[in-house]
Design a protein with these regions (language model features):
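Flexible "cap/lid" loop of the alpha/beta hydrolase fold
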Residues: 93-98, 103-134, 138
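Short beta-strand/loop motif that positions the catalytic acidic residue
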Residues: 191, 197-199
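Gly/Ala-rich beta-loop-alpha elbow adjacent to hydrolase catalytic centers
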Residues: 84, 88, 92
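Catalytic histidine-centered segment of alpha/beta-hydrolase-like enzymes
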Residues: 229-238, 242
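Conserved alpha/beta-hydrolase catalytic His-Asp/Glu region
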Residues: 116-122, 133-189
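Acidic catalytic loop of the alpha/beta-hydrolase fold
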Residues: 202-206
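Active-site loop/oxyanion-hole signature of alpha/beta-hydrolase fold enzymes
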Residues: 33, 42-83, 243
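Conserved HGGG/HGGXW glycine-rich cap/lid loop of the alpha/beta-hydrolase fold
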Residues: 4-54
Length: 250
């Protein structure tokens, strides 16, 4: 699809990884390197992010999920595993609601069904205000610090900063609007896919109540909690994260 960059590596059954707010496909590097030996790994840059930064950004989770489904249809990928992180986890919940029959196994990772994000380190509206007052670079850096136990000393912190820098102010604000206005709680009961829920116990973006809402309402779900991890488990404990996902998928 025009202006949408999709990294496509490896061979085998398709595994689609959807990044979150201020992210990009580059943030999946440890996963791409690991999974491409067993899977065809599909990692899109969402519209307005990464190498899709020339594409028009969206202010609705539903419209982003429609776009991704269209992209997969265009690539003739009719059946796939699907993993979404953070805002990407909201997107994959909506994709499962619309096209659950196309999804073999689903992973909801460091995400939740409530867009207002109760218990977040700051409200979504505060993040919007910070964007306006402090600018994108400072706001993105401050947010990324909360994604790791070690903050900016974390090994993969710079990947997150580089991804954030490729994002425009308009895209960042539109994403926050999309997050705030989305609520997927009522649709969870309709997700019939075998689902793995992954969460770090020090996550400052999505609290335990959000995770438990997923677990209690998705019928065929299993929860795995990583100890001493914040929001970006896949970059804090990549080896254990990758093994956990592989064991679930195979």
């Amino acid at each position: 699809m025009q202006d949408i960059f999709i990294r496509d590596e490896g061979e085998g059954f398709p595994l689609v990884l959807v990044h979150g707010f201020l992210g990009s496909s580059a943030m999946w590097k440890p996963q791409i390197d690991f999974f491409k030996d067993n899977f065809r790994v599909i990692t899109p840059d969402l519209p307005g992010y990464g190498k899709s930064n020339k594409a028009k950004s969206h202010n609705s989770i539903k419209s982003i999920s429609n776009l991704l489904l269209d992209c997969l249809r265009e690539k003739k990928i009719d059946k796939f595993h699907l993993l979404g992180h953070s805002m990407g986890g909201m997107i994959v919940q909506d994709m499962a609601k619309k096209s659950g029959e196309k999804i073999s196994k689903l992973v909801c990772y460091s995400t939740g069904p409530r867009g207002e994000m109760p218990g977040r380190f700051e409200t979504v509206e505060q993040s919007r205000e910070n964007l306006k007052k402090k600018g994108l670079e400072t706001t993105a850096k401050n947010i990324a610090k909360t994604w790791f136990i070690k903050g900016e000393e974390a090994k993969y912190f710079d990947i997150c900063i580089d991804s954030g820098k490729q994002t425009s102010m308009e895209t960042a604000d539109n994403s926050l609007v999309a997050i705030k206005n989305w609520n997927g709680v009522d649709a969870l009961k309709n997700i019939k896919n075998e689902t793995l829920i992954v969460w770090g116990d020090q996550d400052k973006s999505y609290n335990l109540e959000q995770i438990q809402t997923l677990e209690n309402n998705i019928e065929n779900s299993k929860l795995i909690i990583f100890k001493n991890c914040a929001h970006n488990v896949h970059l804090e404990q990549p080896d254990q994260f990758n093994k956990t996902i592989k064991d679930f998928l195979l």
